[in-house]
């Protein structure tokens, strides 16, 4: 059987180990070819090929439900659930998603994109099953990185107190999240993997057993069960933490040995109550370069399969915002030992790996634990440190109560640096940084700013460090800057709550925030071609808003347009409209941003065009709204 013939996971039933191994090779080939051509997550999926096949051969997927944590390791799952022929559309506009979505396929039982949610969801399904008198298996597959998240531990704590609720948790232990794991839980798991008795049994038992005359080969299918029993006798403390929490623990199991996996899962299905199967895998398995560099090959842009190197762009690009941020922060931290960079398992993505390499004592990685990261930063701030919490906009949502309760209510000087703010592209709706303006600006005491380009970002990093009277946040986008000149030192902080006028005109006032400032200027130039002159403001701050600048100009000009790369509801445009109403200035305000929709996966440019956020579309919308002009001249 060829992988392309599999349209239903139950077709794996009855396949021999040899046939499953052939399917595994085909999955890896398709996975590698697709990601090399189009980009995507590489290492996570390569590491769970045998785990997926072994687990699915023991389940009835017409009935049983498997919940994949995060979802970026579920490419093998997609390939055996009827999406082989569409796999070349992965993460592309109108193609299949890079994560799991309930609406995409009947075997995607729970959507995700963020970590640590699978056990809670699977437990909810298991409880509903029992309440409804149904019969199906509920399985959560979670990585050891995601297991460091508090939500996963909360779910384990709950499930362990439900001895009559059948639930299977498969722990995919590859010793990594995106970067190497940190904390006591990964260290405990690693000790179990490396326990000498476990290693001895793993390395020697099977080979010695097969050499027993007459019975060795005939009992080969039972080796998984026998090996599991031997490990539990030899190492009674293996899995003790999970056993104490109410789970039956099995493992560690070789995550690339199909015989052992199938035998273990079959045994696990016979056990009542919550069961945890600990599977040891290798991230990037089957692609040597990814096995050797598990951080670098977690996710890839298009690359050469032979060399592993990214396919170069046709033209040189300016530095990425994250790179400018990290470079500036390191420079400042070298001069100020009180600056402490904090990441929640995203050191490479946020650029804090540069701080770790240069000043390791001024760097903290808390693992996938955004709530802890924020309150840890608050604690550091109480003692005079300058904590810089660099967290993706979409992930900071997970710590909203801590932002309010632990930072803002106490007015502590924590500097939040929100990477990936705005439209992020092919990761889709779970990762779009659309909501931070709305969810932060409503909180008392916090200051919020966004740079128009990478040079202004450098000044905002200084502003955030020097602002010691309360919390402050800076949002910045994924991707590259504009190529404006940068300084190596001597950056001046900005005055809090002050914007700037970039262009003068009498016909319409355009106020841009962050990434929408340059498109504002470009739209103004297009409007000028039609005899309409715009004043353009770079707001810089949404809170406090520069009302001294904005209100008089709005009253004078009489037509206002706001631009933001965030949700319109409660966002920057709403802040401007509220300020004008509070000042009794009644003028029309056209708010342009992301409407009340989920932004699906596509390139950022494709998404912006679909949302009407290109400079030409902005000019068109202004013409239609205020000057009764048809769109054709600027379409």
Swiss-Prot record:
Chain sites annotated for binding thiamine diphosphate: 72, 113-115, 145-146, 174, 287, 370
Catalytic activity: D-glyceraldehyde 3-phosphate + pyruvate + H(+) = 1-deoxy-D-xylulose 5-phosphate + CO2
Listed SUPFAM superfamilies: Thiamin diphosphate-binding fold (THDP-binding) (SSF52518), TK C-terminal domain-like (SSF52922)
Gene3D superfamilies with a match to the protein in the record: 3.40.50.920, 3.40.50.970
Alphabetized GO MF terms: 1-deoxy-D-xylulose-5-phosphate synthase activity; magnesium ion binding; thiamine pyrophosphate binding
Biological-process GO terms, alphabetical: 1-deoxy-D-xylulose 5-phosphate biosynthetic process; isopentenyl diphosphate biosynthetic process, methylerythritol 4-phosphate pathway; terpenoid biosynthetic process; thiamine biosynthetic process
Keyword annotations: Isoprene biosynthesis, Magnesium, Metal-binding, Thiamine biosynthesis, Thiamine pyrophosphate, Transferase
Pfam family, one: Transketolase_C
Binding, Mg(2+): 144, 174
Top-level taxon of the source organism: Bacteria
EC number assigned by the record: 2.2.1.7
Gene Ontology, cellular component aspect: cytosol
Coiled coil: none
PANTHER family, per the entry: 1-D-DEOXYXYLULOSE 5-PHOSPHATE SYNTHASE-RELATED (PTHR43322), 1-DEOXY-D-XYLULOSE-5-PHOSPHATE SYNTHASE, CHLOROPLASTIC (PTHR43322:SF5)
Family the entry assigns: Belongs to the transketolase family. DXPS subfamily.
Subunit comment: Homodimer.
The protein's name in its UniProt record: 1-deoxy-D-xylulose-5-phosphate synthase
Natural source organism: Nostoc sp. (strain PCC 7120 / SAG 25.82 / UTEX 2576)
């Amino acid at each position: 059987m060829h992988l392309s013939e599999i349209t239903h996971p139950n077709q794996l039933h009855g396949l021999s180990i040899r046939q499953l191994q052939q399917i595994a090779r085909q999955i890896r080939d398709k996975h590698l070819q697709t990601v090399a051509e189009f980009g995507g997550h590489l290492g996570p999926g390569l590491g769970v090929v045998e785990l997926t096949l072994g687990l699915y051969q023991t389940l009835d997927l017409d009935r049983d439900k498997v919940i994949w944590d995060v979802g970026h390791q579920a490419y093998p799952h997609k390939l055996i659930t009827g999406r082989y022929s569409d796999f070349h559309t992965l993460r592309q506009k109108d193609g299949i998603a890079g994560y799991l979505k309930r609406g995409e396929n009947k075997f995607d039982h729970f959507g995700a994109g963020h970590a640590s949610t699978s056990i809670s969801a699977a437990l909810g399904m298991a409880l509903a099953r029992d309440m409804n008198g149904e019969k199906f298996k509920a399985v959560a597959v979670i990585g050891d990185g995601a297991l460091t998240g508090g939500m996963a531990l909360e779910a384990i704590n709950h499930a362990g107190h439900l001895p009559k609720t059948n639930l299977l948790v498969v722990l995919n232990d590859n010793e990594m999240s995106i970067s190497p794991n940190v904390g006591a839980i990964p260290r405990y798991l690693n000790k179990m993997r490396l326990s000498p008795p476990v290693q001895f049994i793993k390395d020697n038992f099977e080979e010695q057993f097969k050499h027993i005359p007459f019975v060795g080969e005939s009992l080969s299918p039972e080796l998984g069960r026998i090996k599991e029993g031997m490990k539990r006798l030899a190492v009674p403390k293996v899995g003790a933490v999970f056993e104490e929490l109410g789970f039956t623990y099995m493992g560690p199991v070789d995550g690339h040995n199909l015989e052992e996996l199938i035998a273990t899962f079959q045994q696990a299905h016979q056990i009542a109550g919550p069961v945890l199967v600990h599977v040891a895998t290798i991230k990037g398995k089957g692609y040597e370069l990814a096995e050797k560099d598990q951080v670098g090959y977690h996710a890839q842009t298009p690359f050469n399969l032979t060399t592993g190197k990214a396919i170069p762009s046709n033209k040189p690009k300016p530095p990425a915002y994250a790179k400018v941020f990290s470079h500036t922060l390191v420079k400042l931290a070298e001069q100020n030992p009180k600056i402490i960079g904090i990441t929640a398992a995203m050191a490479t993505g946020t650029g804090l790996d540069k701080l770790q390499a240069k000043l390791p004592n001024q760097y903290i990685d808390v693992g996938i634990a955004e709530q802890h990261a924020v309150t840890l930063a608050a604690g550091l701030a109480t003692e005079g440190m300058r904590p810089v919490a660099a967290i993706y906009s979409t992930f900071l949502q997970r710590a909203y109560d801590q932002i309010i309760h632990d930072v803002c209510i106490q007015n502590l000087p924590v500097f939040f640096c929100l990477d990936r703010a705005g439209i992020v592209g092919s990761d889709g709706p779970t990762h779009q940084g659309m909501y931070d303006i709305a969810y932060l600006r409503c909180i008392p005491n916090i200051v919020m700013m966004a740079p128009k380009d990478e040079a202004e970002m450098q000044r905002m990093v200084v502003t955030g460090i020097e602002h010691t009277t309360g919390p402050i946040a800076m949002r910045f986008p994924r991707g590259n800057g504009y190529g404006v000149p940068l300084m190596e030192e001597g950056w001046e902080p900005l005055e809090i709550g002050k914007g700037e006028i970039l262009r003068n005109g009498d016909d319409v006032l355009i106020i841009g925030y962050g990434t929408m400032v340059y498109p504002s200027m470009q739209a103004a130039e297009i409007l000028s071609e039609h005899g309409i002159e715009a004043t353009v403001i770079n707001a810089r701050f949404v809170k406090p808003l520069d009302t001294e600048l904005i209100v008089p100009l709005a009253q004078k000009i009489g037509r206002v347009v706001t631009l933001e790369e965030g949700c319109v509801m409660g966002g920057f445009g709403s802040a401007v409209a509220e300020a004008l109403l509070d000042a009794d200035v009644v003028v029309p305000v056209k708010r342009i941003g992301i409407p009340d929709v989920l932004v699906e996966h596509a390139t950022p440019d494709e998404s912006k065009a679909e949302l009407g956020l290109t400079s030409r579309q902005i000019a068109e919308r202004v013409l239609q709204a205020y000057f009764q002009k048809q769109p054709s001249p600027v379409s």
